[in-house]
Each structure stands twice: as C-alpha cells, then as structure tokens.
Amino acid sequence: MIVSEHEAMRARRQVALPQDALVDLMDRYEARLQGYLYNLLRDEDAVRDLVQEAFLRAYEQLRRGKPVNGPWLYTVGRNLAIDRLRQQKLVRTDFETVLESLAAEGGTKDFQRALQRLPSNDAELLYLFSVDRFHTAEIAEMLGIRPGTVRTRLFRARERLRRFYQAAEDEA
C-alpha cells in the first residue's frame, strides 16, 4: 500500500499520543461514519452506540501502538452493524434493504432506483465510492478484496447504471 508522508506522520503521532490521535480520528470521521451506519441501520440510537463502540475499539488499537485510519473505522463499524442486524434477527441484512429505504425517502430517486437494480455488492461499492468518497484502495481494505477487483466492479456497476439511465430516457 502506498502511504503519503502526511499519513505516515499521522501514524507516528497515533503511536505517540493515542488520545490526540483519537480526537483527530473523531474530527475527521465521526459524522461520516454516523451517516454510513445510519444508511445501514436506520436507527439513530443504534448508530450512536455503534459509533461509540467503533471509536472505543480505535482507542484500544491506538493504545497498543497500532495505527488506525478511516477504512479501518468503516470496517469495524460495518461489522458492528452486521452483528447488530443479526442480533435483531432481521431477515434481510444485505445492502438492498438500505437502498430501498433510501429510495423511499426521496432525494435522488433515479440514482437510488438505479442502485436497486444492481447486485448488492456493486451497490455498496458505488455508495462507498460515490457518496462517501473513499478511494478504491480504501474500499478494498474495508471489504477485504483487492483494489483491482474494486476497480473492475466499479466499472461494471457504472456500465449497468449507464444502461439503466439510457433505458429510462428511451421510455420517457
């Protein structure tokens, strides 16, 4: 993985001052992580709990001298959300549930409708890339796949979206 000098300096600071590093992480990622988890759970109380748990785990990692970054936090948050959904015995824990909720709320309905037509893995990749603005390497780290796989899936998902939009325009 290629690490910028800025990221390397941040990692060194994390090891030296875990409290300061945690504050830095919270400033940078707390709101974004809350939004991501809310899109998965649709439960504000659960989101607050899981964000707190994710940052607690980040602090524990920092105290052990291990670096923590945004993709790591998202991975922890996502895993906590999946665990929460399993505990609640929800039948559908995949990303399609999230997309249905988003479409029902309005906003960019065409985009959400188009995302619903994609396989849930592709829709999740597009969400992380387009909405949360993560780089392909970060998404790969979060999902445990190779960056090349992320790029390939993003390309295919964009092609499917393009075809959906073209079909919608042809019908109009």
Model-identified regions with their sequence ranges:
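Arg/Lys-rich amphipathic alpha helix in sigma70-family domain 2
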Residues: 64, 68, 78-95, 104, ...
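A short pre-motif secondary-structure segment
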Residues: 125-126
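DNA-recognition helix of helix-turn-helix
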Residues: 78, 82, 143-167
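Conserved RNAP core-binding helix
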Residues: 26, 34, 44-61
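N-terminal module of bacterial RNA polymerase sigma factors
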Residues: 1-35, 39, 172
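Sigma70-family region 2
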Residues: 15, 52-69, 87-89, 164
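Hydrophobic-face residues of short alpha-helical interaction/recognition segments
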Residues: 33, 37, 73, 77-85
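Internal acidic/polar
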Residues: 2-8, 83, 90-115, 135
